[in-house]
Amino acid sequence: MNLMEVRELAPSRGQLDVAAVQVKFDSTELLEDRISRIQDLVSGVGKADLIVLPELWLHGGFSYDSWRKNAISLESEVFTFLSEVARDKKAWFHAGSFMVTEPSSAASDMWNTSVLFDPTGSLRATYKKIHRFGFSDGEPKLIAAGDEPRVVELQTERATAITGLSTCYDLRFPELYRHISAEGTALNVIPACWPLTRIQHWQTLGRARAIENQSFVVQCNMTGVDQEVELGGHSQIVDGNGDILAQADKEEAVLRATLNFDSLNELRSSFPVLNDRRADIWAAKGKTVIASHL
Protein backbone atom coordinates (compact mmCIF):
# COMPACT_ATOMS: atom_id res chain seq x y z
CA MET A 1 0.00 0.00 0.00
CA ASN A 2 1.19 3.51 -0.78
CA LEU A 3 1.65 5.21 2.60
CA MET A 4 1.15 8.58 0.91
CA GLU A 5 -2.22 7.60 -0.57
CA VAL A 6 -4.87 10.32 -0.37
CA ARG A 7 -8.53 9.31 -0.63
CA GLU A 8 -11.90 10.02 0.91
CA LEU A 9 -12.32 8.23 4.22
CA ALA A 10 -15.40 6.46 5.52
CA PRO A 11 -16.94 7.88 8.71
CA SER A 12 -15.94 6.31 12.01
CA ARG A 13 -18.44 3.81 13.44
CA GLY A 14 -18.76 0.78 15.70
CA GLN A 15 -16.62 -0.24 18.67
CA LEU A 16 -12.85 -0.60 18.96
CA ASP A 17 -11.12 -2.41 21.83
CA VAL A 18 -7.87 -0.59 22.64
CA ALA A 19 -4.90 -1.56 24.82
CA ALA A 20 -2.15 0.94 25.70
CA VAL A 21 1.01 -0.64 27.12
CA GLN A 22 2.81 1.68 29.55
CA VAL A 23 6.42 0.47 29.52
CA LYS A 24 9.01 0.94 32.28
CA PHE A 25 12.33 2.14 30.87
CA ASP A 26 15.58 0.71 32.28
CA SER A 27 18.74 2.27 30.83
CA THR A 28 20.86 -0.67 32.02
CA GLU A 29 18.83 -3.14 29.96
CA LEU A 30 20.36 -4.52 26.75
CA LEU A 31 18.41 -3.65 23.60
CA GLU A 32 17.76 -7.31 22.79
CA ASP A 33 16.46 -7.87 26.33
CA ARG A 34 14.18 -4.85 26.02
CA ILE A 35 12.77 -6.15 22.75
CA SER A 36 12.15 -9.55 24.34
CA ARG A 37 10.40 -7.92 27.30
CA ILE A 38 8.19 -5.88 24.98
CA GLN A 39 7.23 -9.08 23.17
CA ASP A 40 6.19 -10.62 26.50
CA LEU A 41 4.19 -7.52 27.48
CA VAL A 42 2.32 -7.40 24.18
CA SER A 43 1.73 -11.16 24.19
CA GLY A 44 0.08 -10.79 27.59
CA VAL A 45 -2.34 -8.10 26.44
CA GLY A 46 -4.99 -10.56 25.34
CA LYS A 47 -7.46 -9.76 22.59
CA ALA A 48 -7.56 -6.16 21.34
CA ASP A 49 -8.29 -4.39 18.07
CA LEU A 50 -5.54 -1.80 18.58
CA ILE A 51 -2.40 -2.11 20.72
CA VAL A 52 -0.23 0.95 21.41
CA LEU A 53 3.36 1.28 22.70
CA PRO A 54 5.15 4.45 23.93
CA GLU A 55 7.53 6.79 22.14
CA LEU A 56 11.18 5.66 21.81
CA TRP A 57 10.84 2.66 24.11
CA LEU A 58 13.78 1.06 22.33
CA HIS A 59 16.13 4.06 22.27
CA GLY A 60 15.13 6.10 25.32
CA GLY A 61 13.50 9.49 24.97
CA PHE A 62 16.33 11.31 26.76
CA SER A 63 19.26 9.05 25.77
CA TYR A 64 20.47 11.62 23.25
CA ASP A 65 24.07 10.37 23.09
CA SER A 66 23.05 6.92 21.83
CA TRP A 67 20.36 7.92 19.32
CA ARG A 68 22.66 8.02 16.32
CA LYS A 69 24.39 4.76 17.23
CA ASN A 70 21.11 2.91 17.76
CA ALA A 71 19.12 4.45 14.88
CA ILE A 72 17.51 1.92 12.54
CA SER A 73 15.98 1.88 9.06
CA LEU A 74 12.49 0.75 8.13
CA GLU A 75 14.12 -2.37 6.68
CA SER A 76 15.55 -3.26 10.10
CA GLU A 77 14.98 -6.64 11.73
CA VAL A 78 13.26 -4.73 14.53
CA PHE A 79 10.41 -3.80 12.20
CA THR A 80 10.26 -7.34 10.83
CA PHE A 81 9.81 -8.51 14.41
CA LEU A 82 7.10 -5.90 15.10
CA SER A 83 5.29 -6.91 11.92
CA GLU A 84 5.23 -10.49 13.17
CA VAL A 85 3.85 -9.33 16.53
CA ALA A 86 0.96 -7.56 14.76
CA ARG A 87 0.25 -10.63 12.65
CA ASP A 88 0.39 -12.96 15.66
CA LYS A 89 -1.97 -10.73 17.64
CA LYS A 90 -4.25 -10.20 14.60
CA ALA A 91 -4.48 -6.57 15.72
CA TRP A 92 -3.65 -3.09 14.58
CA PHE A 93 -0.33 -2.38 16.27
CA HIS A 94 0.98 1.13 16.87
CA ALA A 95 4.47 0.05 17.87
CA GLY A 96 5.50 3.43 19.27
CA SER A 97 8.24 5.54 17.71
CA PHE A 98 11.87 4.96 16.76
CA MET A 99 14.95 6.86 15.65
CA VAL A 100 14.84 6.10 11.93
CA THR A 101 17.23 6.86 9.10
CA GLU A 102 16.39 6.56 5.41
CA PRO A 103 18.87 5.48 2.69
CA SER A 104 17.67 8.17 0.29
CA SER A 105 18.09 11.02 2.78
CA ALA A 106 21.13 13.05 3.77
CA ALA A 107 23.53 11.08 5.92
CA SER A 108 22.84 13.33 8.88
CA ASP A 109 19.04 13.01 8.71
CA MET A 110 17.26 11.05 11.40
CA TRP A 111 13.60 11.24 12.39
CA ASN A 112 11.50 10.32 15.41
CA THR A 113 9.19 8.04 13.43
CA SER A 114 6.02 6.28 14.59
CA VAL A 115 4.96 3.07 12.87
CA LEU A 116 1.54 1.45 12.52
CA PHE A 117 1.02 -2.14 11.37
CA ASP A 118 -2.29 -3.69 10.35
CA PRO A 119 -3.52 -7.13 11.55
CA THR A 120 -1.78 -8.87 8.63
CA GLY A 121 1.56 -7.40 9.68
CA SER A 122 1.75 -4.90 6.81
CA LEU A 123 3.20 -1.48 7.55
CA ARG A 124 0.21 0.81 6.98
CA ALA A 125 1.48 4.19 8.14
CA THR A 126 4.50 6.07 9.40
CA TYR A 127 4.56 9.49 11.02
CA LYS A 128 7.62 11.69 11.53
CA LYS A 129 7.29 13.82 14.65
CA ILE A 130 6.59 17.40 13.55
CA HIS A 131 7.31 19.32 16.76
CA ARG A 132 10.75 18.59 18.22
CA PHE A 133 11.27 18.90 21.97
CA GLY A 134 14.34 20.51 23.52
CA PHE A 135 14.34 24.10 22.30
CA SER A 136 17.92 24.73 21.06
CA ASP A 137 19.19 21.34 22.30
CA GLY A 138 17.79 17.82 22.33
CA GLU A 139 15.66 16.90 19.33
CA PRO A 140 16.10 20.17 17.34
CA LYS A 141 19.87 19.69 17.45
CA LEU A 142 19.90 15.98 16.68
CA ILE A 143 16.99 15.07 14.39
CA ALA A 144 15.07 16.40 11.42
CA ALA A 145 11.47 17.56 11.79
CA GLY A 146 8.59 15.89 10.03
CA ASP A 147 6.33 18.04 7.89
CA GLU A 148 3.41 15.75 7.01
CA PRO A 149 0.39 15.22 9.30
CA ARG A 150 -0.83 11.64 9.08
CA VAL A 151 -4.33 10.19 9.18
CA VAL A 152 -5.15 6.50 8.67
CA GLU A 153 -8.37 4.51 8.41
CA LEU A 154 -8.41 1.60 10.87
CA GLN A 155 -10.82 -1.11 9.75
CA THR A 156 -11.94 -4.07 11.83
CA GLU A 157 -14.96 -6.38 11.65
CA ARG A 158 -16.75 -4.18 14.19
CA ALA A 159 -15.42 -0.71 13.53
CA THR A 160 -14.03 1.96 11.28
CA ALA A 161 -11.81 4.47 13.09
CA ILE A 162 -10.35 7.51 11.33
CA THR A 163 -7.17 7.94 13.33
CA GLY A 164 -4.64 10.74 13.61
CA LEU A 165 -1.02 10.02 14.51
CA SER A 166 1.10 12.35 16.63
CA THR A 167 3.91 12.06 19.16
CA CYS A 168 4.54 13.44 22.66
CA TYR A 169 5.48 17.16 22.33
CA ASP A 170 3.01 17.48 19.43
CA LEU A 171 0.32 17.42 22.13
CA ARG A 172 1.15 21.04 23.00
CA PHE A 173 0.19 22.28 19.53
CA PRO A 174 -3.60 22.22 19.08
CA GLU A 175 -3.42 23.42 15.48
CA LEU A 176 -2.12 19.99 14.41
CA TYR A 177 -5.17 18.24 15.85
CA ARG A 178 -7.60 20.81 14.49
CA HIS A 179 -5.98 20.44 11.06
CA ILE A 180 -6.39 16.67 10.93
CA SER A 181 -9.87 16.84 12.45
CA ALA A 182 -10.94 18.33 9.12
CA GLU A 183 -10.14 14.89 7.64
CA GLY A 184 -12.71 13.31 9.96
CA THR A 185 -10.44 12.02 12.72
CA ALA A 186 -12.35 10.48 15.60
CA LEU A 187 -9.31 9.03 17.40
CA ASN A 188 -5.87 10.48 18.15
CA VAL A 189 -3.09 8.10 19.19
CA ILE A 190 -0.22 9.77 21.06
CA PRO A 191 2.81 7.73 22.19
CA ALA A 192 5.11 9.68 24.49
CA CYS A 193 8.14 9.80 26.76
CA TRP A 194 6.75 12.59 28.96
CA PRO A 195 8.59 13.48 32.20
CA LEU A 196 6.96 13.39 35.62
CA THR A 197 7.80 17.03 36.27
CA ARG A 198 5.13 18.23 33.81
CA ILE A 199 2.72 15.32 34.08
CA GLN A 200 -0.22 17.61 34.90
CA HIS A 201 0.28 19.20 31.45
CA TRP A 202 0.16 15.75 29.85
CA GLN A 203 -3.11 14.92 31.56
CA THR A 204 -4.78 18.28 30.96
CA LEU A 205 -3.67 18.70 27.35
CA GLY A 206 -4.88 15.21 26.47
CA ARG A 207 -8.34 16.00 27.78
CA ALA A 208 -8.28 19.37 26.02
CA ARG A 209 -7.44 17.79 22.65
CA ALA A 210 -10.29 15.31 23.17
CA ILE A 211 -12.82 17.98 24.12
CA GLU A 212 -11.97 20.57 21.48
CA ASN A 213 -12.02 18.02 18.64
CA GLN A 214 -14.72 15.73 20.07
CA SER A 215 -12.45 12.75 19.54
CA PHE A 216 -11.08 9.83 21.50
CA VAL A 217 -7.49 10.27 22.67
CA VAL A 218 -5.15 7.38 23.54
CA GLN A 219 -2.03 8.61 25.36
CA CYS A 220 0.63 5.95 25.94
CA ASN A 221 3.54 7.15 28.08
CA MET A 222 6.75 5.66 29.45
CA THR A 223 7.60 5.24 33.09
CA GLY A 224 10.92 4.58 34.84
CA VAL A 225 14.09 6.71 34.68
CA ASP A 226 16.03 7.72 31.57
CA GLN A 227 19.31 9.66 31.96
CA GLU A 228 18.24 10.85 35.42
CA VAL A 229 14.91 12.08 34.03
CA GLU A 230 11.99 10.55 35.91
CA LEU A 231 9.35 9.57 33.38
CA GLY A 232 5.75 10.30 34.21
CA GLY A 233 3.61 7.31 33.32
CA HIS A 234 -0.07 8.22 33.80
CA SER A 235 -1.09 6.98 30.38
CA GLN A 236 -4.75 7.63 29.75
CA ILE A 237 -7.62 6.98 27.38
CA VAL A 238 -10.10 9.85 27.05
CA ASP A 239 -13.46 10.10 25.30
CA GLY A 240 -14.78 12.97 23.20
CA ASN A 241 -16.45 14.57 26.20
CA GLY A 242 -13.16 14.72 28.10
CA ASP A 243 -14.06 11.87 30.43
CA ILE A 244 -11.24 9.49 31.36
CA LEU A 245 -12.05 5.91 30.37
CA ALA A 246 -8.82 4.43 31.76
CA GLN A 247 -5.76 5.84 33.49
CA ALA A 248 -2.50 4.39 34.81
CA ASP A 249 -0.30 5.51 37.70
CA LYS A 250 3.51 5.31 37.53
CA GLU A 251 3.78 1.53 37.39
CA GLU A 252 4.19 -0.53 34.23
CA ALA A 253 0.65 -1.32 33.15
CA VAL A 254 -1.76 -2.17 30.36
CA LEU A 255 -4.71 0.19 29.95
CA ARG A 256 -7.83 -1.10 28.25
CA ALA A 257 -10.97 0.61 27.00
CA THR A 258 -13.69 0.10 24.41
CA LEU A 259 -14.13 3.12 22.14
CA ASN A 260 -17.73 3.51 20.96
CA PHE A 261 -17.71 5.64 17.82
CA ASP A 262 -21.49 5.47 17.48
CA SER A 263 -21.76 7.23 20.84
CA LEU A 264 -19.14 9.73 19.70
CA ASN A 265 -21.18 10.44 16.58
CA GLU A 266 -24.22 11.05 18.78
CA LEU A 267 -22.20 13.55 20.85
CA ARG A 268 -21.12 15.36 17.71
CA SER A 269 -24.71 15.48 16.46
CA SER A 270 -26.21 16.68 19.74
CA PHE A 271 -23.49 19.29 20.34
CA PRO A 272 -22.17 20.11 16.84
CA VAL A 273 -19.47 22.56 17.89
CA LEU A 274 -17.16 21.49 15.06
CA ASN A 275 -19.67 22.80 12.53
CA ASP A 276 -19.06 26.34 13.79
CA ARG A 277 -15.37 26.47 12.94
CA ARG A 278 -14.46 29.51 10.84
CA ALA A 279 -11.83 27.96 8.59
CA ASP A 280 -12.36 30.81 6.13
CA ILE A 281 -10.93 33.28 8.64
CA TRP A 282 -8.01 31.20 9.86
CA ALA A 283 -6.98 30.34 6.31
CA ALA A 284 -6.75 34.03 5.40
CA LYS A 285 -3.42 35.62 6.28
CA GLY A 286 -3.01 39.20 7.41
CA LYS A 287 -6.58 39.67 8.64
CA THR A 288 -5.87 40.11 12.34
CA VAL A 289 -6.67 43.65 13.48
CA ILE A 290 -4.27 45.09 16.06
CA ALA A 291 -6.23 47.54 18.19
CA SER A 292 -4.06 50.41 19.42
CA HIS A 293 -6.89 52.31 21.14
CA LEU A 294 -10.04 51.32 22.97
From Swiss-Prot:
Pfam families per UniProt: CN_hydrolase
Cross-referenced CDD domains: nitrilase_5
Catalysed reaction, written as an equation: 2-oxoglutaramate + H2O = 2-oxoglutarate + NH4(+)
Domain of life: Bacteria
Enzyme Commission number(s) from the entry: 3.5.1.111
A biological process from GO: nicotine catabolic process
Function: Catalyzes the conversion of 2-oxoglutaramate to 2-oxoglutarate. Together with glutamate dehydrogenase, may form a physiologically relevant enzyme couple, leading to transformation of metabolically inert 2-oxoglutaramate derived from trihydroxypyridine into glutamate, a central compound of nitrogen metabolism.
Protein's recorded name: 2-oxoglutaramate amidase
Originating organism: Paenarthrobacter nicotinovorans (Arthrobacter nicotinovorans)
Lineage: Bacteria, Bacillati, Actinomycetota, Actinomycetes, Micrococcales
